[in-house]
Structure formats: structure tokens, C-alpha cells
A protein has these predicted regions:
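Charged DNA-binding/catalytic regions of mobile-element recombinases
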Residues: 1-215
Length: 215
């Protein structure tokens, strides 16, 4: 994917918002009570697309300050079906990622959306989006990283292949690098053992030929 394509994706999704100082409590702040029960219980498997999504937030420093990424991953194919990038970690970050996933996938009613107990995922706005699209919320336990291990594995790959490869002077250049890696490398070039050595896009195309999933 050309850099101009990555710029277009960022522009179309409104990821060039004005930057401001981070406010409120961070992701590592003490988790609050769950809004949903843990329906996944570390069973990160799905018989088809849009049955189980995982979501979480990661952050990385730039010369201008931190940049936050919220991603939504379909367990069936390991594809990142929605994501949002911003300079502030507010509930809107998680809401935009979930809305992007719904817009891309279409028929998602009944899909379980699993997260940790971060305030962004317990927010009224996020819970409202779940209800509006007939999605089923699920939350892991406090301090149990393994409860969302399949999502953390994606962030570990992102950190190794993008975030820690160099220092980033601006948020814009890191945004471009993240979008390019997800859309060009992770989705279309990186073969995964659990997908029979196929990429996420190949796996969905081959295993679900009758389903018109966006590429």
C-alpha cells in the first residue's frame, strides 16, 4: 500500500484531529467494576467470522507526546476489522474503533465483543454502541492479562515490527506507519500458523467464499 493510500485512510476516518494534552486517568489506572460477564473465559476460537471480536488499547510515545491505538480483532481470521488512532485516550477512541468494525463487516448482530475493564469499554457511549448493533459485551477479570491474550499477541507484533523499530518524531508519521503495517503487511503478507499458513485476508477469502467480507 502506497503512503498516499495510508494518508487517505487516515483522512477518511477522521484521524487527523487536533492534538491536546492527555486528560483523565490512563489505561493502567485501577479498573472499575465490569459492565459485562466474562463470556469468553480464554476460549479464543470462533467457528466463523463475526462470532467473536477482541478489542483493546495500546499506546506509544512520539516526540509530540503519546499516540493511542484501539483495535478490534476478529478471532476467526485474526483480521483487524476496525481501529481508531488518536492523541487522547477517551471513550470516543473505543467507540470509533467499534463503529469502524461494524461498518466494515455489516451483519454483526450476536457477535461477542470481549475487552478488559478499562473505562473506555465501560463507558455509556461504548455500551450504547454495543446495544445499537445487537452486539454482546464480555469483559475479562481484573489483573488477568491472559483473559485477552489473543489481542495482546497482536499488539506484541505491532510493537516489534513498528513501534520499537525507531523513534517517532511526530504522531502523524507513527499513524501512517501503523496503518500501512496493518493494511499492507499484517493483513496481506504475514502468514499465520493457526490459519494454515495463510494471511488473514487469504483465510477469509478461501474459508468463507460465500461471505462478502470487505478487503
Amino acid at each position: 500500500m502506497a503512503e498516499r493510500t495510508a494518508w487517505r485512510i487516515c483522512r477518511d476516518n477522521g484521524w487527523w484531529s487536533a492534538f491536546g494534552k492527555r486528560r483523565g486517568r490512563g489505561k493502567n489506572a485501577r479498573a472499575g467494576p465490569p459492565v459485562h460477564d466474562d463470556l469468553v473465559r480464554r476460549e479464543f476460537t470462533a467457528a466463523g467470522p463475526n462470532r467473536l471480536w477482541l478489542t483493546d488499547i495500546t499506546e506509544h510515545a512520539t516526540g509530540e507526546g503519546k499516540l493511542y491505538l484501539c483495535a478490534v480483532k476478529d478471532v476467526y481470521s485474526s483480521r483487524i476489522v476496525g481501529y481508531s488512532i488518536d492523541a487522547r485516550m477517551k471513550s470516543s477512541l473505543a467507540v470509533r474503533a467499534l463503529e469502524a468494525a461494524v461498518a466494515r463487516r455489516g451483519q454483526v448482530a450476536g457477535c461477542t465483543v470481549h475487552s478488559d475493564r478499562g473505562s473506555q469499554f465501560r463507558s455509556r457511549k461504548f455500551v450504547s454502541v454495543l446495544a445499537r448493533h445487537d452486539l454482546v459485551g464480555s469483559m475479562g477479570r481484573v489483573g488477568a492479562a491472559g483473559d485477552n491474550a489473543a489481542m495482546e499477541s497482536f499488539f506484541a507484533l505491532l510493537q516489534k515490527n513498528v513501534l520499537d523499530r525507531r523513534t517517532w518524531a511526530t504522531r502523524q508519521e507513527l499513524r501512517i506507519a501503523i496503518v500501512t503495517w496493518i493494511e499492507r503487511t499484517y493483513h496481506r503478507r504475514r502468514r499465520q500458523r493457526r490459519l494454515a499458513r495463510l494471511t488473514p485476508v487469504e483465510y477469509e477469502t478461501i474459508m468463507t467464499p460465500a461471505t462478502a467480507l470487505a478487503a
